[in-house]
């Protein structure tokens, strides 16, 4: 839902600025929330007011440009609110050490899961939005979200790196990691499962998603191995 907006936020804050402030969680949150347009209200709580003050200072210092959109909240589970995701991202940036090197050098995907084991700061245990208290719930990045990050970011990046540098070991590792991640569960994978093609891993579910977009949506059934098999079974 917020993919485009999050990309705008990422592009609006140079990575060197984030690196410069990575040891100060409040400053990281101020930069991310401020660029997302989430610090523009009049707050009564001390914490968002502190972030607001930090952001105004950092915004003037770095002359940051505001993004066009704002994160949406509609049709979202509270645990997936953009406020929670940005708070988790801030902690990840603070805790991460040489993440790209870990991707290249590690052979075990569990090392990546370990680095993605992040929990937002204490304020968010009692909030989903600024200024609105809620029952206590630890805002820990869930396994499903970690899977999604690995599937859609880490694995493609590692494979692309291997392709660019002609390093088959990176490409093989990317595919091996993809095969070790749980299959995604969505309308597309469930549809294939009903047709007799269950996804055993993220390797399968990504293949089904690609088939759906490239063949099913384009009505290229006769060019598709799965489509041809289904058509043969119907014609018998």
Regions found by a protein language model. Give the residues of each.
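Hydrophobic, aromatic-lined core segments that form the binding pocket/scaffold
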Residues: 1-205
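Acidic, carboxylate-rich catalytic segments that either coordinate divalent cations
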Residues: 194-236
């Amino acid at each position: 839902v917020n993919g485009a907006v999050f990309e705008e936020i990422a592009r609006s804050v140079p990575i060197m600025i984030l690196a410069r402030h990575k040891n100060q969680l409040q400053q990281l949150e101020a930069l991310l929330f401020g660029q997302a347009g989430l610090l523009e209200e009049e707050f009564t709580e001390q914490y968002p007011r502190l972030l607001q003050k930090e952001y105004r200072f950092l915004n003037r210092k770095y002359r940051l440009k505001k993004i066009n959109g704002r994160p949406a909240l509609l049709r979202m589970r509270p645990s997936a609110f953009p406020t929670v995701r940005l708070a988790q991202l801030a902690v990840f940036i603070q805790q991460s050490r040489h993440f790209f090197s870990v991707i290249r050098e590690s052979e075990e995907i569990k090392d990546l899961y370990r680095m993605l084991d992040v929990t937002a700061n204490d304020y968010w245990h009692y909030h989903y939005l600024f200024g609105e208290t809620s029952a206590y719930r630890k805002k820990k990045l869930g396994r499903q979200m970690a899977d999604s990050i690995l599937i859609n970011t880490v694995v493609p990046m590692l494979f692309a790196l291997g392709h660019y540098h002609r390093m088959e070991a990176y490409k093989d590792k990317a595919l091996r990691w993809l095969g070790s991640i749980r299959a995604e569960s969505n309308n597309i994978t469930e549809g294939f499962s009903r047709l007799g093609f269950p996804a055993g891993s993220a390797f399968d579910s990504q293949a089904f998603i690609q088939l759906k977009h490239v063949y099913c949506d384009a009505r290229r059934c006769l060019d598709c191995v799965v489509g041809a098999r289904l058509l043969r079974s119907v014609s018998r």
